[in-house]
């Protein structure tokens, strides 16, 4: 199978490597490729949308003519992992913890409301062990992370974190074939990439 990583910004190399390691661990034959153009989305069995800065990613995708095609691919049922700013890009409702509504380009395919920069600035980044439904306990790295303020069906919360500033917050969501995280699993684990590959292989 061929799996793609949106390569406009963020931890592209880390996602590619996580897919390669996940495939090896599952004994699945998979080619991990960078996606920068709409035509490179054709024939993908799975997709990852990395973090970075969600407004920049959305505007770049729009300028490159890839935003609408991305939406179509995700809506068509291609198993998708979206991390941090990638999760923001997927959400139907987005606001910033400081400036409020953002008006940024969105895919708007995930039934979730997201608050950007919910934990503060870069210096407020942190790590925590997180129990994720269906995946297990993972070490999660939160870098200028968002939170999911709410979800509605068919999306559901699959992980929470208790934080002194943000309180008890949803930090991972699943909606059918989509996994979205507020943190960066590509930095610490292959668990989420394995889950997406297993969806693509019809195992999960």
UniProtKB/Swiss-Prot annotation:
Q: Which domain of life is it from?
A: Archaea
Originating organism = Pyrobaculum arsenaticum (strain DSM 13514 / JCM 11321 / PZ6)
User: Which Pfam families does the record associate with it?
Assistant: SNO
Sequence similarity:
Belongs to the glutaminase PdxT/SNO family.
Reactions catalysed: aldehydo-D-ribose 5-phosphate + D-glyceraldehyde 3-phosphate + L-glutamine = pyridoxal 5'-phosphate + L-glutamate + phosphate + 3 H2O + H(+); L-glutamine + H2O = L-glutamate + NH4(+)
The record ties this protein, via NCBIfam families, to: PLP_synth_Pdx2
What function does this protein fulfil?
Catalyzes the hydrolysis of glutamine to glutamate and ammonia as part of the biosynthesis of pyridoxal 5'-phosphate. The resulting ammonia molecule is channeled to the active site of PdxS.
Identify the Gene3D superfamilies for this entry: 3.40.50.880
Q: In which pathway does it act?
A: Cofactor biosynthesis; pyridoxal 5'-phosphate biosynthesis
Residues forming the catalytic site: 84 (nucleophile), 184 (charge relay system), 186 (charge relay system)
The protein depicted here goes by the name Pyridoxal 5'-phosphate synthase subunit PdxT
**Which GO cellular component does the record give, naming just one?**
glutaminase complex
EC number annotated for this UniProt entry: 4.3.3.6, 3.5.1.2
Tell me which InterPro entries the record gives.
Answer: Class_I_gatase-like, PdxT/SNO, PdxT/SNO_CS
Query: Which keywords does this chain's UniProt record carry?
Result: Glutamine amidotransferase, Hydrolase, Lyase, Pyridoxal phosphate
Gene encoding the protein: pdxT
Q: Name one GO molecular function term.
A: glutaminase activity
**Its Gene Ontology biological processes?**
glutamine catabolic process; pyridoxal phosphate biosynthetic process; pyridoxine metabolic process
Q: How does it assemble?
A: In the presence of PdxS, forms a dodecamer of heterodimers. Only shows activity in the heterodimer.
Residues involved in L-glutamine binding: 52-54, 116, 143-144
């Amino acid at each position: 199978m061929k799996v793609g990583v949106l390569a406009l910004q963020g931890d592209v190399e880390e996602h590619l490597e996580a897919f390669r390691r996940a495939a090896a661990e599952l004994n699945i034959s998979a080619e991990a490729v960078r996606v920068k153009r709409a035509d490179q989305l054709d024939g993908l069995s799975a997709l990852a949308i990395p973090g970075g800065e969600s407004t920049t990613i959305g505007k770049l995708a729009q300028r490159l003519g890839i935003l609408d095609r991305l939406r179509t691919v995700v809506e068509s049922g291609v198993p998708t992992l979206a991390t941090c700013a990638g999760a923001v890009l997927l959400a139907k409702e987005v606001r910033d913890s400081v400036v409020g509504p953002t008006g940024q380009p969105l895919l708007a395919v995930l039934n979730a409301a997201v608050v950007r920069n919910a934990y503060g600035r870069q210096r407020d980044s942190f790590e925590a062990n997180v129990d994720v439904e269906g995946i297990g306990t993972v070490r999660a790295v939160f870098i200028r992370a968002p939170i999911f303020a709410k979800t509605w069906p068919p999306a559901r919360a699959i992980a929470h974190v208790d934080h002194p500033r943000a309180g008890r917050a949803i930090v991972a969501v699943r909606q059918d074939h989509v996994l979205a995280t507020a943190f960066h699993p590509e930095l610490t684990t292959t668990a989420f990439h394995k889950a997406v590959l297993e969806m693509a292989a019809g195992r999960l």
